[in-house]
């Protein structure tokens, strides 16, 4: 039982398959793309998982095991608001079969942190155009129209 622990805990990928039962006592599982953000994040009633960018099969299987054993949990993903962040989220949804919702990867967040956004490169535009007809259409259209992207490290959660 880890519910009373404060702070981070690391579990080796090598033992994830050996874990038989995972009971999440909070309401949410939140996956995070970047390590800096993971270390600085506290999200009440959430089990937070660091993905390290593109997730591997071991992490995906662990997440699927959590979903199977905790069917009422909400799954969120917090990543960069750029083409890479949305590709990671789309890949996570496809490979796990879980309906992850983007967390703070929206127009409101881009507007709030406008001073920290960066301009899109030509490659960013190409990649975003390929994603524009996905479930993330609203934020991607905004990014293309306003020539902006945002690293998740600029966003304050705590």
Predicted features and spans:
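Conserved beta-strand segments of alpha/beta enzyme cores
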Residues: 47, 99-101
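Acidic beta-strand-to-loop metal/phosphate-binding motif
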Residues: 73-82
């Amino acid at each position: 039982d880890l519910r009373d622990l404060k702070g981070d805990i690391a579990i080796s990928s090598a033992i994830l398959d050996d874990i038989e039962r995972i009971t999440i006592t909070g309401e949410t599982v939140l996956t995070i793309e970047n390590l800096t953000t993971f270390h600085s994040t506290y999200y009440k009633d959430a089990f937070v998982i660091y993905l390290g960018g593109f997730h591997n099969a071991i992490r995906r299987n662990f997440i699927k095991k959590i979903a199977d054993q905790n069917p009422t949990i909400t799954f969120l993903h917090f990543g960069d608001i750029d083409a890479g962040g949305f590709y990671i989220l789309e890949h996570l949804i496809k490979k796990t079969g879980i309906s992850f919702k983007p967390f703070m990867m929206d127009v409101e967040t881009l507007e709030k942190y406008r001073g920290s956004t960066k301009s899109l490169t030509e490659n960013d535009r190409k990649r975003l155009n390929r994603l524009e007809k996905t479930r993330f259409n609203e934020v991607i259209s905004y990014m293309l129209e306003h020539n902006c992207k945002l690293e998740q490290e600029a966003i304050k959660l705590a």
